[in-house]
């Protein structure tokens, strides 16, 4: 693998692959040769620093890393999360073919379908008013209490699919900061509110702290007996859920082969289903399944997740770019960059291989971004003229949902395409000076100002185009990036499905809480931590 990466570095130098502008000038067919489509989903990577020899080298890299074999092992239900000894089967949750998926010799699809059916019945009953609050009033507001994968996915998808909302209002509480739950409760009528507590073990400290506050809100306003009417849970800890006061009929489970950041397809997606209805949720699953089938069957050069992963690895380890910007030109995808940040950085932010050896490559890049056009007035300056090259990943729909505002969507599309073109083309010193002198500036002043208006260009970007942001399209986008993360993890030869860095933070916070509460001394902690504890306790009221 290391030798193949070094060969790719040599090829990139020999072919001047990073001169993307020259590549377009030399090849009028570059777009058609370095783009591919799956139904209405278009993937354009012609503005990336690649050529035929680079793609050949990346294909050889994928074969050497056995990416396709690892992919097949995941879909087969093999134990690929080796540190937790688990299969990785979020794909089974959206397996619309209903082909058997075996874990330990047992087909999981009957259980998957049973939970999906129970979710649908519960969502229908909440939406129709068949299930009411303790005082007989229809539920108008649903609050999801979770954190991490139990929050980011539902929040992102609910915002993305706002045009399809025809159910109760949705709210999300995640942060243990009391301001989050307090601000949400001020918006609610306890008689018409339902809380969904999303925690597989029902022990997640942030979630259970917020759930206790919500429980006190209902019990205090409506009485202890009302609690069961105003809560549901997504959990497998039936005993703990029961002790909390939630009836087993209102508990929806999922499995240890579903990681939190991959769980939007599971019962964690219940709030989304309540918002958009079970039929639209089904279309969401259909979109994810469509990408699964494409990922499993398409040849590498037409396989969008495979290409996306290979280009990501290439940008990080051949060209040395340390981050990537996710830039959806779709306001309703406002939380999609944050969702992908968790998906990518929690999955591939690892330093040890599957063989328990140090990784020989640079692993997950920093993933960040904002929707366009907002980002253009914030951080695009750095992408265009900063000293680091930051590959950009644009997303744009051909159609918005606001038919009477078509002119605004046209402006949005123009901005998206203009940014990708500008990143590639740039502006030379001569062009910058000519622009200034054409406006009447004298040569001496233009010579001084022009360097500030130079754009080096050759900044790589890729663009994903889809028809319209609907449940099916969103399902495809999420699955596309899930599999991209898988491909990169396979190339790194790491376990993309554990998260011991997250667990470390939980352990340390649990140990420090008694010190913050004043029950234990800070002795044994470093001087910085002890000093910060002392300062906080001194100022606390």
Swiss-Prot record:
SUPFAM superfamilies (UniProt xref): SIS domain
Reaction catalysis annotation: alpha-D-glucose 6-phosphate = beta-D-fructose 6-phosphate
A GO BP annotation: gluconeogenesis
EC class: isomerase
Keyword Isomerase: yes
Molecular function in Gene Ontology: carbohydrate derivative binding; glucose-6-phosphate isomerase activity; monosaccharide binding
UniProt keyword list: Cytoplasm, Gluconeogenesis, Glycolysis, Isomerase
EC number(s) given by UniProt: 5.3.1.9
Principal location class: cytoplasm
Superkingdom assignment: Bacteria
Pathway participation: Carbohydrate biosynthesis; gluconeogenesis; Carbohydrate degradation; glycolysis; D-glyceraldehyde 3-phosphate and glycerone phosphate from D-glucose: step 2/4
Subcellular location as annotated: Cytoplasm
GO CC terms: cytosol
Catalytic residues of the enzyme: 346 (proton donor), 377, 506
Family the entry assigns: Belongs to the GPI family.
Summary of the function given for this chain in its UniProt record: Catalyzes the reversible isomerization of glucose-6-phosphate to fructose-6-phosphate.
PANTHER family registered for this protein in UniProt: GLUCOSE-6-PHOSPHATE ISOMERASE
Protein name: Glucose-6-phosphate isomerase
Protein species of origin: Rhizobium meliloti (strain 1021)
Gene name tied to this protein: pgi
